[in-house]
Amino acid sequence: MTNSKRPVYVITGFLGSGKTTLLNHLVSHVEMKDTAVIINEFGEVGIDHMLVKSSFEDVVLLKNGCLCCTIRGDLLDTLETLAIREEQGEIPSFSRVVIETTGLADPAPILQTLMIDPIITERYVLNSIVTTIDSVNGLAQL
């Protein structure tokens, strides 16, 4: 790993608002080939990871709860494990991380982890938060 901090991008929004579509569009660009993708799923069986076209060597799927609530520690573990596995040569080098939250997530605890946790802030920096909105039903969901 280099000494520079890796940017983290968080994609969030309600169910059906286009998060996975946006992610698919992003990962189709050659400039994004060295990106680690973390897809958060809620419930027993996740489906978003099956909808994301296989563009990366390493997609980490967190499916045992919502990132914002019950597995915030797992986000920390996942980001740390990605860095360690890269350092050990187990996965390809990556220059950025994209986290797609579940449509049920409140992104606040995720952002808190990314901005405050010393283990994370040593290696990563929150770059941006992208919120998708269903243009037809968005107003009704607010």
Language-model regions: role of each:
Residues 9-12, 17-38, 42:
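A conserved segment at the C-terminal end of the G1
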Residues 85-142:
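Phosphate/Mg2+-binding loops and adjacent switch elements
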Residues 22, 74, 78, 109-113:
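Alpha-helical scaffold elements adjacent to nucleotide-binding pockets in ATP/GTP-utilizing enzyme cores
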Residues 54-81:
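Conserved nucleotide-sensing/catalytic segment adjacent to the nucleotide-binding pocket
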Residues 33-49, 124, 128:
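Short beta-strand-centered segment that lines the nucleotide-binding/catalytic pocket of NTP-utilizing
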Residues 4-8:
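Pre-Walker A (Motif I) flank of P-loop NTPase domains
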Residues 25-26, 51-54, 111-115:
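Short, glycine/charged-enriched secondary-structure capping and boundary segments
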Residues 15, 41, 75, 100, ...:
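Residue-level signature of catalytic and energy-coupling elements of molecular machines
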